[in-house]
Amino acid sequence: MQDERPVDQLTEAEAAAELAHLAEAIAAADTAYHTHDAPRISDADYDALKRRNRAIEERFPALRRSDSPSERVGGALAEGFAKVRHEVRMLSLENAFELAEVEEWIERIRRFLGHVGDLRFTAEPKIDGLSLSLRYEKGRLVQAATRGDGETGENVTENARTIGDLPTELTGAPDLLEVRGEVYMRHADFAALNERQEATGQRLFANPRNAAAGSLRQLDPAVTASRPLHFFAYAWGAHSEPLADTQQGAIARLSALGFATNPLTRLCTGPDELLAHYADIERQRASLGYDIDGVVYKVDDLALQRRLGFRASTPRWAIAHKFAAELAWTQLEGIDIQVGRTGALSPVARLKPVTVGGVVVANATLHNEDYIAGRDSKGQEIRGGKDIRVGDWVQVYRAGDVIPKVAEVDLSRRPEGAEPYRFPDTCPDCGSAAIREPGDSVRRCTGGLICPAQQVERLKHFVSRAAFDIEGLGARQVEALWRDGWIRQPADIFELPNRYRDGLQRLENREGWGRKSAENLLAAIEARRRIALHRLIFALGIRHVGETTATLLATHYGSWAAFEAAMTRAEVGTGSEWQDLLSIDGVGAVLATSLVTTFHQEAERAAIDALAAHLTVEDAEMRAPVESPIAGKIVVFTGTLEKMSRNEAKARAEALGAKVSGSVSARTDLVVAGPGAGSKAKQAAALGVETIGEDAWLRLIGDA
């Protein structure tokens, strides 16, 4: 994030473009982590994206998107499980990586509450597993659900019943009680499971979290029962009567009901005690026998928790103090160039293998040519301007199951004669020119569909889980079928059963294929001839169109016929179809140009039409609008509010769908003015913006 411009220097157009990019990046990270159990970026990088998004939204409230990451929790649901709507949302936590961020969080709480006395907090290890909500009625477990997107999860009740330390009956519990916690796998059990997987020729799990998530989300409960899962309880959802008056008391009550709770939970006062317990837990981390990735702090007084309430996706009364990324030094042995589906040339460091956080690392991303040269995409120095050369000793870090990164270079150990790296200006796969367009941070191959690397990567994207998700057709199978000339574009996949009347026999004779796997693949292809509109749009692999944008486009146009017709008629920069495209919240000129250009390129359009001929595309589900008198409006508070704090008023407005701004402009819909209102009230009057008092505000939102 070192190439960011300060938020106060952004123009409105720049802010809108960056919010669109951030929405895509965060949505992709959410899906990778929550839906596919395969995180792609570190927690620190993820949190930096979220902070940047929040800062831009606060500076430009009118640009807040309908798909804002600030209002989203988790990822999309996997297919195969019944959906469960959470009576009380399962939210994520705000993250902190430095003590200063924890101190700032405490200060925000004090300001929100107007509280000057001592505040007490609980501090507990943050378990690196899968969140689970357990619903008990009359003491009996009746439902277990994953977090999903926070609003709706997956019904895994039968699987949860197989977890040994998870009680299925409670004595002395409220008539209704939802207990929430984390499913995890111990290190020793994880090692034994992977040994069994290897012995039976099955896929190995990358880490205990992935193993726990994959084991709980099995369609066959017998498989889950064979896996050694455990559960720590740490929270609750819906309940018919309170568990206690404090967080600590509620955890003690859960323990008395028979739930495993973490023995390292402590009651602390102030940041010094919190940090001391954080350090104590970090010292014990390696010997705990299960993975943790930080310490969670919560306001202990439940009455204060209720007053503090929630932001769109996180509670104000809790924060996760994450552990720093793990680091190691090793030597850079070479730099390889990989070509992605949009032609991006990505440099990858080939490293002398080194262990980082218990995982052997032999490759790491180098991002782009600027990063190698020691500068960001705007020409500003990073790493003190030190470039990266083959032979250098570099510092590598990773946090979670993500692509490792090179953080630093030790110039004192640079070999004599090490030459500056010259980034290629031609594609290593097809030889086409590789150009870097103004404003782009990467160099791209211009070969398009003639580039073998782009063909393969587009096909991999097409069959990925968020796209067509064809069972039995993963990256390795795509590479093999492409190499043998069976498939070149997505339509070829659907022509396999018809084009090769003896296709089943030919598949069966291939290495790694048997009769059953061949039958299953052809059946899976047939099953995917019917596809949801948003999945198809995402699967096309159009540059700048991620999962979130694909869903927005699908919702806007409703059907494939309407979408295809609009893209056909649209002209870049002009016409009603172009303006209609730009009117979609989250679609800017760059993204719109990419869409329209793709549909107007002859080869690209031919490939799209050939694919569509094989498909039945389901129309999009239309979302119901938020029902509130202030939904979608920009509200400004000024002066002194007497019946609630300014922060509480802001939180209430945002919960009802409004956007709260700190300044009055022509876009402002409503100003709420209390005693002492000054320049903002005058500015509102000059602009003709409606201004009301606090009592009228409370009546408007139904809180009078």
Curated annotation (Swiss-Prot):
Catalytic residues per the record? Answer: K126 (n6-amp-lysine intermediate)
- Give this protein's Gene Ontology molecular function annotations: DNA ligase (NAD+) activity; metal ion binding
Q: Pfam families per the record?
A: BRCT, DNA_ligase_aden, DNA_ligase_OB, DNA_ligase_ZBD, HHH_2
Q: Name one GO biological process term.
A: DNA replication
Pinpoint the BRCT domain residues: 625-704
Instruction: Give the catalysed reaction(s), semicolon-separated.
Output: NAD(+) + (deoxyribonucleotide)n-3'-hydroxyl + 5'-phospho-(deoxyribonucleotide)m = (deoxyribonucleotide)n+m + AMP + beta-nicotinamide D-nucleotide
What GO cellular component entries does it have?
cytosol
Coiled-coil-forming residues are: none
User: Which co-factor is required?
Assistant: Mg(2+); Mn(2+)
Q: Which domain of life is it from?
A: Bacteria
Keywords for the protein's UniProt record, in alphabetical order: DNA damage, DNA repair, DNA replication, Ligase, Magnesium, Manganese, Metal-binding, NAD, Zinc
Enzyme class name = ligase
Question: What NCBIfam families does the annotation carry?
Answer: dnlj (TIGR00575), PRK07956.1 (NF005932)
From the Swiss-Prot or TrEMBL record, give the protein name: DNA ligase
Native source species: Cereibacter sphaeroides (strain ATCC 17025 / ATH 2.4.3)
Q: What is the lineage of its organism?
A: Bacteria, Pseudomonadati, Pseudomonadota, Alphaproteobacteria, Rhodobacterales
